[in-house]
Amino acid sequence: MEALPLLAATTPDHGRHRRLLLLPLLLFLLPAGAVQGWETEERPRTREEECHFYAGGQVYPGEASRVSVADHSLHLSKAKISKPAPYWEGTAVIDGEFKELKLTDYRGKYLVFFFYPLDFTFVCPTEIIAFGDRLEEFRSINTEVVACSVDSQFTHLAWINTPRRQGGLGPIRIPLLSDLTHQISKDYGVYLEDSGHTLRGLFIIDDKGILRQITLNDLPVGRSVDETLRLVQAFQYTDKHGEVCPAGWKPGSETIIPDPAGKLKYFDKLN
């Protein structure tokens, strides 16, 4: 007996059954990507959601339920405590002009070298302005400050030329270094490959070019100028006197002689 055609398996008055038979055939003929797109296509973020999502993570941690965040991917850092700081050079904006800058320009001085995610953002201008406003305090202890991001020098200059009341920097006293190739950020282990910018990394480099301190912040929280000053002062004290600084040490506070007998002098006073 001759086999009936597929579409002849039902009578004309069974249209619903005929459509059910056709559905698997249509799904088989559709490209796989088209079917997958029905399940995986993401809804575009609204303007309100965009305001809560910035630089690879939420600006406000409490808003985490609004938008999912991919895991960050960091490069292996060449920056190691007590070792020479990774060399860098590039174009910076200094006093409104483009100038070439390199790490060795600061040999003989301490250097606070910090990364921030992006120009024209939220927390970043508050940090740069805070460090810039207190530059003389750093210079009084033979220390300079340089800020760096993956933006171009042209974007840096545009940000500097934007008034502070509009989220700009205005006249700023510290150099803004451009890391457009991302190489400096990668060498220092702060570059987020999945986001195209950096974490808030801060590095204290001593007058011999040795890296003494590393701080890494996630994106929503800025850094403390007071704590950075304290750390520089503490490292400089130990360099000069050979004694070590206890927790919370500030200039004028007691230090510890680092040997079994010498330490007793400090702990006897403390207790």
Swiss-Prot record:
PTM remark: The enzyme can be inactivated by further oxidation of the cysteine sulfenic acid (C(P)-SOH) to sulphinic acid (C(P)-SO2H) and sulphonic acid (C(P)-SO3H) instead of its condensation to a disulfide bond.
Give every Thioredoxin domain span.
79-237
Q: Which Pfam families match?
A: 1-cysPrx_C (PF10417), AhpC-TSA (PF00578)
Alphabetically sorted, this entry's keywords are: Antioxidant, Cytoplasm, Disulfide bond, Endoplasmic reticulum, Oxidoreductase, Peroxidase, Redox-active center, Signal
Localization (cell): Cytoplasm; Endoplasmic reticulum
Q: What does this protein do?
A: Thiol-specific peroxidase that catalyzes the reduction of hydrogen peroxide and organic hydroperoxides to water and alcohols, respectively. Plays a role in cell protection against oxidative stress by detoxifying peroxides and as sensor of hydrogen peroxide-mediated signaling events. Regulates the activation of NF-kappa-B in the cytosol by a modulation of I-kappa-B-alpha phosphorylation.
Q: Which protein is depicted?
A: Peroxiredoxin-4
Q: Which species? A: Homo sapiens (Human)
